[in-house]
Amino acid sequence: MAEVIILPEDYWVFDFTRGGDPDFECPFPYQIGRYDEIRPGMYDQAIFEGKRDLHVGIDIGTPVGEPVHAFGAGVVHSLGINDEPGSYGPTIIIKHELDGKPIWALYGHLSMESLQMVEQGMNIAEGQIIATVGDKSVNGGWEPHLHFQLSWDEPTGNDMPGVVARDDRDWALEKFPDPRIVLGPIY
């Protein structure tokens, strides 16, 4: 399987279990935000309904414009803009196969130009550049990063909840498996 972001040897792994620190300046240009992590106080936008703070994807912080690669061969399921404050902004979902089963991968917080790089129904090769990472002005208001998430269930649109309520943890972890099954041991 291909890396979705080509990571350097050294990068930062965040611990957001005590929330984010707005004054912290990461000493590395590449960072990881963990899967299955409760992140108190980080999601105050309306779409999170005041109760969703369990992150069910992996975030890979990068410089703006960093190429995003498909982890495996697949077909573009959908693409579009999730434009609510705090959402993904430009988003691409690709249907892949893993161990003979269909699995959908969401690539979120992309650049606007990414939506011109692929089209719905397009065949994608393993490792193909499908997008680039967007900046805060288009990606929902977040520092530049790729939100990468898997789903065993076909999405009904061009979205998946990347953050769920703590009460939904068991259901969410079953539906949205740990992305390290395709990313490898990145932390």
Predicted regions and their residues:
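Short, conserved secondary-structure segments in the cores of folded domains
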Residues: 64-67, 114, 120
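Short beta-strand micro-motifs in enzyme catalytic cores
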Residues: 58, 90-92, 144-146
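Short, glycine/small-residue-enriched coil/turn segments at secondary-structure junctions
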Residues: 48-85
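Acidic, glycine-rich catalytic/binding loops that coordinate metals and/or anionic ligands
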Residues: 1-5, 116-138, 142-187
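Zn2+-dependent peptidoglycan hydrolase active-site motif and core
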Residues: 70-114
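Histidine-centered active-site/metal-ligand motif
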Residues: 55, 96, 109, 145-147
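Polar/charged, compositionally biased leader and regulatory segments
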Residues: 1-63, 169-187
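Terminal peptide-recognition signature
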Residues: 60, 74, 94, 127, ...
